[in-house]
Amino acid sequence: MDEAAGLGLNYVNIHHGSEYHPFINYPFIETENLKHLVQYAAYKDIGVNVYYTVREHSNHMAEVFAYKALGDEIIYRKNGDGHSWWKGVPEWLTEYFGDTILPAWRVYYKHGKYKGDADISFIVRPDSRLDNYYIEGLDWLIKNIGIKGIYIDDTSLDRTTVERAKKVLAQNGGMIDMHMWNHEEPRAGDTSCMNLYTEIQPFLDSLWIGEGYAYKKLSPEYLLMEVSGIPYGNASQMLEGGGEPFIGMLYAMNNRYGWGVKNAHHIYKLWDDFGIEDSEMRGWWHSQNPVCTGNDEVKATVYLKKGSALICMYNFGRHAAYIRPRIQENLLGFSPRTAFRPHIGTIQHGGRADLHKGLRLGAKKGMILEVKA
C-alpha cells in the first residue's frame, strides 16, 4: 500500500493466492488481516477491490461438502471428455467428488502460513441459487470488511446478478473491475469477449483486456471495438506482454501497475503533469480530430486543453513512416508555437520536435508530442 500511495495510485486489487486472500473466490477466512489491510489502505486514500466471483470455488470453503450434498445443483460436472485448462485432476477432487468433477485454478503454497497446503478449486453451475449466496457474501464484505469493489476474472454471472451486485456495491463505492482473457480460440468457444459480455457492460467500471491479446498484431479498428471499452463507455487497461503504451494512448488505455512490466506509473505521471482529466479526447476515428498524419497506417489521437494538447501517434505499418502532421487550428483551438516530446520514464526520451520538418516513426512504434500556444 505504501508503494501504491507513493505512486499516486487510488485503487489496489487483492488477488487470490495472497496472504490476505489465500483462497479463490472465498475471502471469508483471513477476514481480520483483510480488514486491517482495507483500513490501512483507506488511511492512504486507496480503495481495495477483492477478487470475488462464482465461477469456481475452493476446497477450503466451509460449505464445500454442503455443495456435495446438493448433488448436481451447485457442482458443474463434465459431459463427455469435457475440458480443463489445467492438465490432470487433483487427487483430492476425485477422491471426494468423483471423476466427473471439473478442476479449475489451484495454488500450492510454498511458504507462509499455508506452506504445504493447496487451494484446489472446481467449477460450479451458473444461474443457480448460489448467486443469491454470492450477493449476500458481497454485502457482508462491504459492511464488515469495507471493500470498495470487486475484481472478477471473466465471469459466469448473468446480467441480473451483476446488476444486483452493482446495487450492493453502491453502498461503498460501487466499482466492478473485470478482466477478460481472449476467447477467440477453439477451447474458449471462439467468440468475441465484447459479444460474450455485452449484457453486463453497463454495470462494469473498468476493464482489463487481457491475456492472449497481441496488441501490436491487432488492427486499430479491432483495438477500438474489442479492447478499448470505448464503445461501451468503459475504461480499459492492457495486460499481455506489458501492453504497448503508445497504442494504449490512442484509446486512453494504460498498462496495469504491479503486473508484468512495471511502467504504468510513467503514463500516470504524464497524465497528471498534463492534467488529462481536464482535457477532451478526440480519437483517431473522431470527425473533429484536429490532426491528420497523411498516412492511413499512422493513427493519431489528440487530448485537447485550452492552449495545449497531447498528440499521440502510432505506426501500425510494417515499415518506417515519415510523416508531417497537418494540424487544423480551428479544431485544435489555438495556434501551436512550440512542440516537444515529453520525457516519459522508460517509455520515451524527451526532446524538441519540429512539426514542419516531419517526423520518423519506425514500424510498430509510437510517439507522444505536446504542443502549446
Name each region found by the language model:
Residues 350-373:
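C-terminal beta-strand-rich structural cap/linker in extracellular carbohydrate-active enzymes
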Residues 15-31, 115-132, 145-156:
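The substrate-binding groove and active-site-proximal loops of carbohydrate-active enzymes
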